[in-house]
């Protein structure tokens, strides 16, 4: 049986992996629009 801390860490890693590229693209497009 998995510990709840392990589950929280797995969910946190999954969120970082899925939202990482989106945040990078968002920041790059925002900087490009500011220029």
UniProtKB/Swiss-Prot annotation:
Membrane topology recorded in Swiss-Prot or TrEMBL: Single-pass membrane protein
Role according to the record: A core subunit of photosystem II (PSII), probably helps stabilize the reaction center.
A GO biological-process term: photosynthesis
InterPro entries documented for this protein: PSII_Ycf12_core-subunit
Keywords noted in UniProt: Chloroplast, Membrane, Photosynthesis, Photosystem II, Plastid, Thylakoid, Transmembrane, Transmembrane helix
Family designation: Belongs to the Psb30/Ycf12 family.
GO cellular component terms, semicolon-separated: chloroplast thylakoid membrane; photosystem II
Keyword match Nucleotidyltransferase: no
The keyword rRNA-binding belongs to this UniProt entry's keyword annotation: no
Ranges annotated as spanning the membrane: 6-26
Pfam families: PSII_Ycf12
Name of protein: Photosystem II reaction center protein Psb30
Quaternary structure note: PSII is composed of 1 copy each of membrane proteins PsbA, PsbB, PsbC, PsbD, PsbE, PsbF, PsbH, PsbI, PsbJ, PsbK, PsbL, PsbM, PsbT, PsbY, PsbZ, Psb30/Ycf12, peripheral proteins of the oxygen-evolving complex and a large number of cofactors. It forms dimeric complexes.
NCBIfam families: PRK13686.1
Subcellular location: Plastid, Chloroplast thylakoid membrane
